[in-house]
Amino acid sequence: MNDFWQHCSALLERELTPQQYVTWIKPLAPVAFDASANTLSIAAPNRFKLDWVKSQFSGRIADLARDFWNAPIEVQFVLDPKAGMRSPAAGAAPAAPRAPLASGPAATVAAIAANLTANQSATPAAPADVPMTPSAAAAHHLNNDDADIDLPSLPAHEAAAGRRTWRPGPGAAPAAGGEADSMYERSKLNPVLTFDNFVTGKANQLARAAAIQVADNPGISYNPLFLYGGVGLGKTHLIHAIGNQLLLDKPGARIRYIHAEQYVSDVVKAYQRKAFDDFKRYYHSLDLLLIDDIQFFSGKSRTQEEFFYAFEALVANKAQVIITSDTYPKEISGIDDRLISRFDSGLTVAIEPPELEMRVAILMRKAQSEGVNLSEDVAFFVAKHLRSNVRELEGALRKILAYSKFHGREISIELTKEALKDLLTVQNRQISVENIQKTVADFYNIKVADMYSKKRPANIARPRQIAMYLAKELTQKSLPEIGELFGGRDHTTVLHAVRKIADERSKDAQLNHELHVLEQTLKG
C-alpha cells in the first residue's frame, strides 16, 4: 500500500503544478488496503479536501491503482481521524525567490530613511543656497499656487543638478530625516504595496517576474512594461511594488505614480493656464513613470498627444515607463495608433483571475494581516465560490470578520454562508456551462451542437477543448459533470483538454488573448 502511494504521489507530482500537488495530494495518506475486496482507503485532512479530491482526482488515482495491482481497484476517501491534531496543510502560493524586502509601510519608510542616511554620508549634499531652476520653480509654483494641478515639486538641488541617470551622482540624493516621507508624497506611491506581500500564483507569476526584472533593471529590460487584466487582479499593486523597490535601491530616483484620469485632468488644467512648458518639464524629467488604467485616455486626443511626447522623451532618456489597462493594448478603443505601437514595443503581460489555490493563499494571508486565524476549510469554501478578483475576496473576508464580531461567533463555514448569503446567491447564477458553450461557439463560428458531437476536425475539437477548459475554470462543476454536458464524454477527456489548453495558454500569446476576451465576455 505504501509502495503504491509513493509511486502514485511521484506520478501526480509530475502531472500537476507544484501548487496543486502541495495543496491536494501531499496532505493525503493511504490508511487501508483490502486485497480481497480490492478497495483502497485514502484519508484527507478535512471535508472540503475530501470532496474536492474525490471529484477531481479519484479517477486518476483509481487508474494508477489498477495499473499497479493489475486489477480494478475501488478508491475510497475518508476523513483522517487525526486531522484535528495536524497543522493546516500549505495552501499559500510559494513566492518566487527574491532577496528579502521590507514588509509594510513603516518598514519600507524606515528602510528608505536608512538608505537616505547612507547616501548622504557617502555623497556630498548640494549647497543649500543653490538657486531654483526655472523648471523647478514652475513645478513649485504649480504645486503650491494651483494645487489642483498634480505636479509635485522637486527638491531644488535635484533640479539644479540636471537630469540624472539611474546611477546616483553628486547632489542626487535628497536630505535624510523626514525626506523619506516627502518622497512618498512626491511620488504618490503607496508604501503598503510591495513585492513582499504580493501573493503569487500561475495567474500572475509572469507579470511578477517581469515586474521584478524591471525594478532591478529600469529603463533596460522591458520598456514600456504593459500590464493588462480585469479589475482587482493586482496590476496596481505590482506597479507600486516596482516603484517602492526602486526607492529602496535608489532613494534619489524621480518616480511618479498617477492614475490616467488625474493625468487627463492635469492636461486640461495646464492647457487652461497655459502651463504646458512646465507640465512637460516635470514629466519629461522623471526616471520612472507609472500610469494606471490608460484606457481612460480613450477619445482624449490632446492628452494622448502630450503623453506621446512624454513617452518619447522618457524612453530616449532611458527612463522606465509602466502602463496598466483593463484590456489588451490593441483592444483599447479611441487610442491613437502611434501610441498603440509604442505600447507594443515593450513587453505586454496579462494578469489572469487567480486560480483556486492562489485565492486560498490570498484569503489566509489577508486574514493573518488582520490578526485572525482563518481555518483552511473556510478559506477553501470562500475561494471556491468567489472567483473573479482579489478585491472581491478581500471584501468578502471583511464581511465575514464583521459578521463574526457583531454576532460574537467563531468563524465557521455556517457563519460564512450566512455572512455571504447575498453574494453567494449572485455568484451561483452567473456562469453556466451552457452559456460557455454558446459563447465559445459564437466566438469560433461553429454550431453549439458541435460541442456535444463526436466530430474531431481541428476547427471543432479545438473550440470544444477551450470550452471545457473555461467550464472547469469558471464554474463549480466537477470533471465528470462537465464531461456529461459535452455529449457524455469521460472525465479523463475533460482533464486532457483542461491540461492541454492551460499548458498552451502559458506559451501562446494569441490563445491567451482569445481566452482573456472570452472570460471577460462571460463575466460581463
Swiss-Prot record:
It holds the Pfam family Bac_DnaA_C. Coiled coil: none annotated. CDD domains: AAA, Bac_DnaA_C. One of its GO terms (molecular function) is ATP binding. PROSITE patterns: DNAA (PS01008). It is found in: Cytoplasm. GO terms for cellular component: cytoplasm; plasma membrane. It comes from the Bacteria. Transmembrane segments: none annotated. Residues 188-404 are annotated as: Domain III, AAA+ region. ATP binds at residues 232, 234-236. GO terms for biological process: DNA replication initiation; regulation of DNA replication. Residues 72-187 are annotated as: Domain II. The keyword DNA-binding applies. Residues 1-72 are annotated as: Domain I, interacts with DnaA modulators. Residues 405-524 are annotated as: Domain IV, binds dsDNA. Keywords: ATP-binding, Cytoplasm, DNA replication, DNA-binding, Lipid-binding, Nucleotide-binding. The keyword Heme does not apply. Plays an essential role in the initiation and regulation of chromosomal replication. ATP-DnaA binds to the origin of replication (oriC) to initiate formation of the DNA replication initiation complex once per cell cycle. Binds the DnaA box (a 9 base pair repeat at the origin) and separates the double-stranded (ds)DNA. Forms a right-handed helical filament on oriC DNA; dsDNA binds to the exterior of the filament while single-stranded (ss)DNA is stabiized in the filament's interior. HAMAP family: DnaA_bact. Oligomerizes as a right-handed, spiral filament on DNA at oriC. Domain I is involved in oligomerization and binding regulators, domain II is flexibile and of varying length in different bacteria, domain III forms the AAA+ region, while domain IV binds dsDNA. Belongs to the DnaA family. This is Chromosomal replication initiator protein DnaA. It comes from Burkholderia multivorans (strain ATCC 17616 / 249).
